[in-house]
Design a protein with these regions (language model features):
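Conserved phosphate-binding/catalytic region of the ribokinase-like
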Residues: 1-5, 151-155, 203-312
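Glycine/charged-rich beta-loop-alpha catalytic/anionic-binding loops adjacent to active sites
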Residues: 18-28, 131, 235-245
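Short beta-strand scaffold segments in enzyme catalytic cores
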Residues: 42, 88-92, 227-230
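Short, conserved phosphate/pyrophosphate- and ester-handling motifs at nucleotide-, phospho-/glycolipid
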Residues: 44, 193, 253
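Conserved N-terminal subdomain of the carbohydrate kinase-like
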Residues: 50-133, 302-312
Length: 312
């Protein structure tokens, strides 16, 4: 497939507390970046694909970091500097099995996206436009921007990929459902978890088949430790998850999407795409941070060929 990935959304600073327990007792913190769309862009770039990210950041040190990190990862970054602040998320483990994330993003630079921020030439030249259900929740103008980009992709004959990515801290299911359903109907490729599919469709039935009934030709249901199921051009697929030691589950879904889309851009078939997606998601959760664990091709080869925990 000619062209690369183009995506747009909000990337934030990420403060992650060390250890396990209440945030007030944390002994140290790591600072990085995170955002679903930029995670996918970085993931595609690390797997050898071309990726472009479009978004707003503040005129602050966190905005500087985001721009440097994206470009350092080989992502083509269209960064619009805004007078508002760069958003922030704070992540800590209350218990070994409970991860808690707080967002400080209302009114942030990233939420102030407008349709004019999206370069028409970037969309026209893309192989895939990838958007998520997070950005439409940020503001009215951000929602307009997502649908503007999707319509521009349609006009140019560019494949549209949507990750439903419902965030209950950003909007209610009542407000989200019709918007997410509208996005799904405009996509050729859709990713969703079982609960997200139910949010869009209501309960009952096979989620992949029902989402495909809205128009997409490729529907992938991400189901964590259970692996994934998919309906791709009418063919059913199921792939088991790989068993790994989970360090940080955040970012696994983005790694999965990046693996699938990177292989799709490279011309791989459905089975190969899903296998890469599963492996990328598994590799990502073995690292702390949102994007630090996104794998390279050699990383995936090592994971899939490993018979023990020693690299020789």
């Amino acid at each position: 497939m000619s062209g690369g990935l183009v995506t747009l959304g909000e990337t934030m600073g990420l403060v992650a507390a060390d250890g396990i327990g209440s945030l007030e007792f944390a002994r140290g913190f790591a600072f990085g970046i995170g955002g679903a769309e930029s995670n996918v862009a970085i993931g595609v770039a690390r797997l050898g694909g071309s990726a472009t990210w479009i978004g707003r950041v503040g005129r602050d040190a966190t905005g500087d970091l985001i721009e440097r990190r994206l470009r350092g990862e080989g992502v083509r970054a269209t960064v619009i500097r805004d007078s508002s602040f760069t958003g922030l998320m704070v992540k800590h483990r209350r218990t070994a099995g409970l991860l808690h994330v707080d967002y400080h993003r209302a009114g942030s630079a990233g939420s102030r996206l407008v349709p004019a921020d999206v370069p028409a030439a970037a969309v026209r030249s893309a192989g895939i436009l990838h958007v998520t259900g997070i950005t439409p929740a940020l503001s009215g103008t951000a929602r307009e921007t997502v649908f503007h980009a999707v319509e521009a992709a349609h006009a140019a004959g560019v494949t549209v990929s949507v990750d439903v990515n419902y965030r209950s801290k950003l909007w209610s299911s009542y407000d989200a459902a019709p918007v997410l359903r509208d996005l799904v109907t405009r996509a050729q490729v859709v990713f969703a978890g079982p609960d997200e599919a139910e949010l869009v469709l209501g309960p009952g039935g096979n989620p992949a088949e029902r989402l495909a009934g809205l128009g997409p030709s490729e529907v992938v249901i991400k189901d964590g430790a259970r692996g994934c199921t998919a309906l791709i051009e009418g063919e059913r697929h199921a792939v088991k998850a790989l068993e790994v030691t989970v360090v940080d589950p955040v970012g696994a879904g983005d790694a999965f999407v990046a693996g699938y889309l990177a292989d799709r851009l490279a011309g791989a078939g459905p089975a190969a795409r899903l296998g890469t997606a599963i492996a990328a998601g598994a590799f990502a959760v073995t690292f702390p941070g949102d994007c630090e664990g996104l794998p390279t091709r050699p990383d995936l080869e090592s994971l899939l060929s490993a018979t023990d925990n020693v690299s020789r």
